């Protein structure tokens, strides 16, 4: 149904309690116009069935990024602030490949492993945006606590960006 390099962006997250008798919850965004896959050579291509990002019109939908590098090792292992910075750098690299900047992000969804100090994440997140963003505007966001992510990863972030005028 999808060409090998044209899978939709995706974040694979385990959430323990979706509700009574709920086994799966899925959200899909459909678009009938032209779509293009955008991938940065600076970011590791994850084996599997999703793209780093997909551009639909002026919108860029970015798959969840984490702190795993090209060597398949987690960068800043055990350090939530460090992993947040690496994860946001991956996100920014993909945005730049699409011609965007951090200022174009309108929403992020953050997945934090349970038991992490959210204030450390929030401080690293704000610091990164303050350093690389031209505006003081932060994107809308949602933070979800999860039981686990990729092995040794403490944070994963997916994003939606608007690249229009």
Predicted regions and their residues:
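N-terminal presequence-like segments and the immediate start of the first folded domain
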Residues: 1-89, 93-107, 112-165
């Amino acid at each position: 149904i999808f060409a090998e390099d044209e899978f939709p962006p995706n974040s694979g997250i385990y959430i323990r309690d979706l509700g009574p008798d709920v086994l799966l919850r899925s959200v899909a965004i459909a678009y009938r116009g032209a779509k293009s896959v955008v991938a940065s050579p600076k970011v590791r291509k994850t084996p599997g069935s999703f793209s780093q990002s997909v551009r639909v019109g002026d919108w860029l939908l970015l798959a969840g990024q984490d702190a795993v590098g090209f060597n398949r090792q987690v960068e800043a292992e055990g350090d939530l602030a460090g992993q947040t910075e690496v994860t946001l750098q991956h996100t920014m690299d993909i945005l730049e490949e699409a011609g965007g900047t951090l200022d174009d992000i309108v929403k992020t969804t953050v997945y934090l492993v349970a038991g992490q100090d959210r204030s450390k994440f929030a401080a690293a997140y704000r610091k990164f945006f303050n350093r690389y963003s031209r505006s003081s505007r932060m994107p809308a966001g949602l933070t979800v606590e999860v039981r686990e992510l990729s092995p040794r990863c403490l944070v994963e972030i997916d994003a939606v960006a608007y690249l229009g005028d």
